[in-house]
Amino acid sequence: MLAFRMRKVIFAIALLLSLLSPAHSACDDPLADGVDYSKCRFSDGQDLQGSFLPNSNLSFTSFIQVNFDKSIMMNSNLSFGTFPESTFYRANLYESVMIGANFEKTNFTGANLTNADLMGSTLIEANFQNANLMGANLISANLINANFEGANLIGANWTDGEKCGPQSIGDCKK
């Protein structure tokens, strides 16, 4: 009788854990909220404008020259992904983790990157014009020739680990 009860408890716990874990998707499944597309390679040049991808795992993915304009990707993991020459115009990346990702020549114009973690990311020639990077982590990021014109950098952790001051619009004033 005890063994039967234990099996029921184990089954109930396994069922509960399967319901609480993020959805694991095949790389060709439609993009959606909370899914795991880690290590997928998507076609170059796709138009994913307006995608709804909050809480999703896009780590180690490849999205070259992809349009994510006006997409909702808050609380998502884009770490170690490849996104060169992509566009995130007015995208919501609030509190997303983007550690070590490649965003070379990527357009973040008007994007919400509040509290985003971009530590160690490649942001060479990235465009952050009028983007909100308040509280973002840019420690050890490569910002060569990046454009921050009009960007809100208040409270951001700059590449050297120092916090940007309250007048940091367009550049980090420590």
Mark where each language-model region is.
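Bacterial N-terminal signal peptides that target proteins for export
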Residues: 2-10
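Bacterial N-terminal signal peptides
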Residues: 10-19
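Tandem repeat scaffolds
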Residues: 23-174
